[in-house]
Each structure stands twice: as C-alpha cells, then as structure tokens.
C-alpha cells in the first residue's frame, strides 16, 4: 500500500482478525463506535475475542451485537449495565468481564500507547473487589494500586474525517477513547464518515496523526436505532 493512500475496503481492514484476537473498539454507548467494522467482524464469524471498550453497548448498538452473538470471551470495560445480555452472560459464566473504572481504563490504554508497563492509581484502593490480585505500592507515603497497561492486536476506531494518509479528526464527544486506542494497538483501522485528499485537513485540526493508522474505510453509516429514538 502506498504510504499516502491508506483508504481500503472494510473486508481488507478486518481480514487478519482471527479467533482469540484482542480488539479495542472506540465508543461510548455506541457513540463513536465504528458500526461498519463491527458489523463486518460479526459477519466474519470470528469468536473467542477479547474486547477492550468503554462499555458493552446496547444489545443492538455499538459492540453489543458481538456480545449478543457470543463472539466475545473476555470483556474489559468500565460498565455493562446498558446491555442486559452482557450481564446475563457474565452471571452464567459464559462471558468473563474485567471491570475497570472509566478514568483508570482510559489511562491504562494511554499507558499502553506510550509503551509504559502500567499506571499508579488510588481509585478503588479501599475496595476489596478492585484490589484483588493487584500489587500495591507506597509512594511519598500514599498507597497506590498498580494497574497494568492495555494493548491490543487491533484497534477499530471511528473518526469524523480522515485523509488519505490516515490523519483523523473527531466529532465532539464521539472522540471519547478513539485517539488513545489508535496508539495502543499493534494495528489500527479507522472508519470515517468522509475521506479527503491529504492536505485538506488543517494540521491544527488533526487529533490522531496518520502514522498511527494503518488503514481507513468509508463508513456505511449507522444501521441501528439509537436508544433515545
């Protein structure tokens, strides 16, 4: 692929995802999720996935369909309350859920992208469930949990505008964890509403530099109905 021509097909973007892959998905309750890439991964039939995402989406929104169709073996997220299927699978033991407070989750992903081994945080230091099986250190007289950094085989993220080099801009709060995930995965693919020639995005507007992005696909749009509609 030419370095300045990263626009690819959706099928090409997901071609190397295999059973057992570790995937990051941007999105907050589906907002900022890459709908076309999620649908393609679902249609591909891959399973036993480890998914890192802010939340479990809704049954028909965001990463929800991957969970509903039992493609996810392990979910690392800050909450799952909006998707009752995820809660049911967790209590039945068919889905492993690793909860991480939202801010901690973001920083663990950021650490992964920065090449750090983890972060120190006092969030949950007095909660036995949060502290279980985690190391605690004392720095300047204060106790902290050591939270491991998070990385992935692939990050599938959503952008508003991409150029042909993979430089990305985002639409307001749809940005959420997408820029962090772009840096924390071995391979990153972005789904964008628009793909423009290189140079059309002002350098002041670029949030994710194209050096972090392997390929961009044009979004086919949201096919689900939002919860508030």
Swiss-Prot record:
<comment type="similarity">
    <text>Belongs to the 3-oxoacid CoA-transferase subunit A family.</text>
</comment>
<protein>
    <recommendedName>
        <fullName>Probable coenzyme A transferase subunit alpha</fullName>
        <ecNumber>2.8.3.-</ecNumber>
    </recommendedName>
</protein>
<dbReference type="Pfam" id="PF01144">
    <property type="entry name" value="CoA_trans"/>
</dbReference>
<dbReference type="InterPro" id="IPR037171">
    <property type="entry name" value="NagB/RpiA_transferase-like"/>
</dbReference>
<dbReference type="InterPro" id="IPR004165">
    <property type="entry name" value="CoA_trans_fam_I"/>
</dbReference>
<keyword id="KW-0808">Transferase</keyword>
<dbReference type="InterPro" id="IPR004163">
    <property type="entry name" value="CoA_transf_BS"/>
</dbReference>
<dbReference type="GO" id="GO:0008410">
    <property type="term" value="F:CoA-transferase activity"/>
</dbReference>
<dbReference type="InterPro" id="IPR012792">
    <property type="entry name" value="3-oxoacid_CoA-transf_A"/>
</dbReference>
<comment type="subunit">
    <text>Heterodimer of a subunit alpha and a subunit beta.</text>
</comment>
<feature type="binding site">
    <location>
        <begin position="26"/>
        <end position="32"/>
    </location>
    <ligand>
        <name>CoA</name>
    </ligand>
</feature>
